[in-house]
Amino acid sequence: NTMAESVIFIREHGINSIKQLDKYIQKSAEERQDLQDKMKEIDKDMQLLSDTMEQVHTVKKYRAYYKEYKANPSDKAFFEEHKAEITHYEIALSKLKKSYSKLPNSKDILDKLNKLQEKKNTLIQEYSSTKSTMDELYQIRKNYGIYMGKEMER
């Protein structure tokens, strides 16, 4: 940013003091942080959905073993042979039951994941565009200090 561009920016935004400029920079930094927080929230939601997807897959994969075991609970040999599959099924099902009344649909989960990814991509674009804005603001802040006769640290 040239000195002239900095002066134009300051005038266009009605900034009349270093204090106002600092407030503007602070507000921009907070907006940038807000975008980052939203992205973290989306990441959390996506992780939960991915975990759910994995549990649904496990339940479907081992359901037959579990049904066979429930149909013949006295068949100890079958239980011993398929103990791992039955246990995986029970754990996955119990996790799903904490959040869902019936087995969630994989397609619905994928749709939600896709929507969240789109939202996140938009936020990422906004976030990266705020990076250059912040760099510009810090340069304007520096130029303002020089313009006013003293170099100021950001």
PLM-predicted stretches and their roles:
Residues 1-154:
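Extended intrinsically disordered terminal tails
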